[in-house]
Amino acid sequence: MGKFHTTLPQSHIPWILSQPVFFVSTAPLSPQGHINVSPKGTFPNINSFGYIPSHDSDPRKPAQFWYLDLSGSGSETISHLYEPGNGRITIMFCEFRKAAPRIVRLFGRGKVLENGTKEFEEWTKKEGVEVIPGARSVVVVEVELVGDSCGFAVPVMEFRERREVLNEVFRKRVERAEKGVSEESMQR
C-alpha cells in the first residue's frame, strides 16, 4: 500500500542520494502527445543531483529536487516543461539492491535553467554544482507531493558500473574545440 506525504520524510533523503539511477517522467498537455520516461544515471564524484529542503524563512516554499541534465538524445523533458501551462514532472527512485524494497516518487512542477544563461550560472555557483562538458541544463523540481510505496515486485539487480561513453564524447569535443577544430562545437 502506498503512502503520500506533503513533504519528503527526512529518513528518505540519504536513500535517494545513494541511488545510482532514477527516472524522470513528463507529458505534454495534448492527448495526442506521448508520455516521456527517461533514465538518469548519477555520478559519484560530482554534485549531479540533489535535494534542497524548504527554507525556514519561508515554510510555504516547497522543497526542491534538482538534477544536471546532459545532452544526448532528445530533449523531450525540457520541451514538456516549457509548454505553456504545463511543467508537470515526476521523479522516481527504486531500490534495486538487496535491501528493503522501496519506490519513492516526487511529484511536482519543473523549471529548466539552461546552460549559458545568467540564471544557470548563478544557480550552479550557489549550489556548488560542477558543470561538466555536455551539461545542457539543470532541471529544478518544486516537490508538491511524495509517493512512497513498497516495491515488492521490483527485481533485485546488482549495480556493476556507470557508463562513461557520454562523458568521454564530450571530453573529446572539448579537447578538439580547444585545439581550434571549429566544426566540433559544444552542444548544450
Spans of features found by a protein language model:
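Binding-site signature for planar aromatic cofactors or substrates
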Residues: 1-188
